[in-house]
A protein has these predicted regions:
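Active-site-proximal substrate-binding core of FAD-dependent oxidoreductases
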Residues: 14-17, 52-95
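Context-gated lysine
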Residues: 20, 49, 59, 69, ...
Length: 133
């Protein structure tokens, strides 16, 4: 029969160092999955490509610098994840209230002004949509 091996956590949030000696971490190994949607295939493919390019150029530090600066790995995603992962039902209802009739940039701006305590979440999600996550 089949054996159950369990599930594994999907790592996200950039690790301390993605380059060490002759080793470059990419994708899940570098914790590059998006913490809002857990998407990681695109990040893995793109980070693999960037890692190879930096190796071919003989400048692996460029790969590390790319990860620290690219908006794809913006710390606001992890910040938003940490906040909404701790929400209770009442907080979810409160945060989503401005979007009961749909989602749009004006509604997002309205939500930030009406519920500033959730502004970091709103901005993280907006950035994710803008970047195509």
């Amino acid at each position: 029969g089949l054996e159950y091996w369990g599930a594994r956590d999907l790592p996200f949030g950039v690790v301390g160092s993605v380059v060490k000696n002759r080793c470059l971490l990419i994708g899940d190994a570098a914790c590059l999955a998006n913490p809002l949607c857990y998407g990681g295939i695109g990040a893995a493919m793109l980070s693999g490509r960037r890692a190879v390019e930096s190796i071919v150029e003989g400048r692996p530090e460029r790969y590390s610098r790319w990860i620290s600066k690219d908006r794809m790995f913006d710390p606001r995603f992890l910040d938003a994840h940490r906040i909404f992962s701790s929400w209770n039902d009442a907080e979810i209802i409160d945060a989503m209230h401005p979007f009961e009739k749909g989602y749009s940039v004006p509604r997002g701006v309205f939500a930030i002004f009406r519920r500033p305590k959730w502004a970091r979440v709103y901005m993280g999600v907006f950035l994710a949509f803008r970047l195509g996550w």
